[in-house]
């Protein structure tokens, strides 16, 4: 088995170049992700629909593009939010917008900054999302809970992410395959 690696050990400069190329690809992907985060003002500018709660608008596995620079959210808009204490983004439609409620600690020119409050519901669900919110939470806060509003989507391409989440061993296989391809690449 080690004899098959001998051509790569004979030329360490070429091997180092291939490893650096692999690192360059990974760091470039990271920089693109961070640039998208800054442009969209969202920590996660691209998310995958994980359930069927928004059918027929979005199917499980659809890839959504978010925008979080709008100062307000309107009724009927599809938003992505995180529930406090959980790390799974939820994609649902805004059903009701409550009057702006002053937040504590944050002040603007007039003295108190208001934060929009929202009630959401999945298109394919029978009831609103109050059961999904954190205990004691009756609505979402626009500034703290929302990741962004959906501005576009690509159908079904997110199934790769779902497969990697549901079958963790696939991550190892995929990373190993990518590393092997970089190492076996001839220039």
Curated annotation (Swiss-Prot):
Which GO MF term does the entry hold, naming one?
A: serine-type endopeptidase activity
Q: Which GO BP terms sit in this record? A: signal peptide processing
Give the positions annotated as glycosylation sites. 125
* Residue ranges of coiled coil: none
Q: How does it sit in the membrane?
A: Single-pass type II membrane protein
Residues in the Lumenal compartment per record? 40-187
Q: Show the catalytic activity.
A: Cleavage of hydrophobic, N-terminal signal or leader sequences from secreted and periplasmic proteins
Q: Give the top-rank taxon of the lineage listed in the UniProt record for this protein.
A: Eukaryota
Q: Where is the protein localized?
A: Endoplasmic reticulum membrane
Q: What is its EC number?
A: 3.4.21.89
Keyword list (alphabetical) reads: Endoplasmic reticulum, Glycoprotein, Hydrolase, Membrane, Protease, Signal-anchor, Transmembrane, Transmembrane helix
Mind telling me which residue stretches traverse the membrane in this protein? Answer: 19-39
The Swiss-Prot or TrEMBL note on domains reads: The C-terminal short (CTS) helix is essential for catalytic activity. It may be accommodated as a transmembrane helix in the thinned membrane environment of the complex, similarly to the signal peptide in the complex substrates.
What's the name of the protein? Signal peptidase complex catalytic subunit SEC11
Taxonomic lineage: Eukaryota, Fungi, Dikarya, Ascomycota, Pezizomycotina
């Amino acid at each position: 088995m080690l004899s098959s690696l001998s051509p790569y050990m004979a030329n360490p400069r070429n091997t180092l170049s291939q490893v650096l190329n692999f690192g360059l690809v990974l760091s470039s992907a990271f920089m693109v992700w961070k640039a998208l985060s800054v442009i969209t003002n969202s920590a996660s500018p691209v998310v995958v629909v994980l359930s069927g709660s928004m059918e027929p608008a979005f199917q499980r596995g659809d890839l959504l593009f978010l925008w979080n620079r709008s100062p307000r959210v309107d009724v009927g808009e599809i938003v992505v939010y995180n529930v406090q204490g959980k790390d799974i983004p939820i994609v649902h439609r805004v059903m009701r917008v409550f009057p702006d409620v002053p937040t504590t600690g944050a002040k603007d020119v007039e003295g108190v900054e208001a934060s929009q409050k929202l009630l959401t519901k999945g298109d394919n669900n029978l009831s609103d999302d109050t059961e999904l919110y954190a205990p004691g939470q009756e609505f979402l806060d626009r500034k703290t809970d929302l990741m962004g509003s959906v501005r576009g989507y690509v159908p079904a391409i997110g199934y790769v992410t779902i497969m990697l989440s549901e079958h963790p061993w696939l991550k190892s296989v995929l990373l190993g395959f990518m590393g092997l391809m970089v190492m076996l690449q001839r220039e």
